[in-house]
Amino acid sequence: MNEFDRVRDYLTDLQDRICAAVEAIDGKARFAEDLWQRAEGGGGRTRILRDGAVFEQAGIGFSDVSGARLPPSASAHRPELAGATWRACGVSLVFHPHNPHIPTTHANVRYFRAERDGEMVAAWFGGGFDLTPFYPVDEDVMHWHRTAQALCAPFGEERYAAHKRWCDEYFFLRHRNETRGVGGLFFDDLGQDFERDFAYQRAVGDGFLDAYLPIVERRKDTPYGEAERAFQLYRRGRYVEFNLVYDRGTLFGLQSGGRAESILMSLPPQVRWEYGFQPQPGSAEARLADYLIPRDWLG
């Protein structure tokens, strides 16, 4: 089996396993599957869970797409690849819980290959996972980062620190001067050693559930009221702003003629903006700002 097919098979299995785990913890709703084809090449399967007991919306998509020419978002930092043919596969997810005390989360693992005249000119892995709480709890954030550190450990002492820092820098809203959440891991252009890099991608993909599900279990029955729900919807606005203004995956998908429904499944089903909103000093809502600055979470 060639390298691309090995990655593809892993990713489809990962999607299946994550869906099964989410359905089990939700206990009410199930994922609906939408199979799609892309005229320019390839296709995918988008799965959406709606109106569950735990999740307002959980979306997880697998795609295997190709094209005759790289879009600008992919070749901007690799000008030598401009005009190359390409093929990419990946799994991307965003989960929006009902309860404001459960963080929103995002994860992505992907593989990209570019060719010219039938010869591979570049191939690399990318991905990571990050956490966006509205009412953060130190225990949860520390668990998230300790899980990330543990899965990075076999790949060198500097791996966690480097990819945590990359995550903090990538998921940053410059126009708001704040991070999107409390970070996690982010990596791109990892293409020096296929076997080692593929092993790391698998560690990140497999580690996501270990990082997230214990937090869901701890917070899913926490009581909340209208004020907490309103703040959750307001903060979801930051999620929308990041995805539509900065996110490379969103821009790549839209610029490459990707399927808009699948690309934009990351957006929350409900969201609100409020001009000039300021939380009450000393409130739980005001406390969030202290978490939107990169810091060491390992304790």
Swiss-Prot record:
Subcellular location: Cytoplasm
Molecular function as annotated in GO: coproporphyrinogen oxidase activity; metal ion binding; protein homodimerization activity
First-tier enzyme category under EC: oxidoreductase
Pathway given in the UniProt record: Porphyrin-containing compound metabolism; protoporphyrin-IX biosynthesis; protoporphyrinogen-IX from coproporphyrinogen-III (O2 route): step 1/1
Entry coiled-coil feature ranges: none
The protein's Enzyme Commission number: 1.3.3.3
GO annotation (BP), single: protoporphyrinogen IX biosynthetic process
Active site (UniProt): H106 (proton donor)
GO cellular component: cytoplasm
Role played: Involved in the heme biosynthesis. Catalyzes the aerobic oxidative decarboxylation of propionate groups of rings A and B of coproporphyrinogen-III to yield the vinyl groups in protoporphyrinogen-IX.
Annotated protein name in UniProt: Oxygen-dependent coproporphyrinogen-III oxidase
Organism annotation: Xanthomonas campestris pv. campestris (strain ATCC 33913 / DSM 3586 / NCPPB 528 / LMG 568 / P 25)
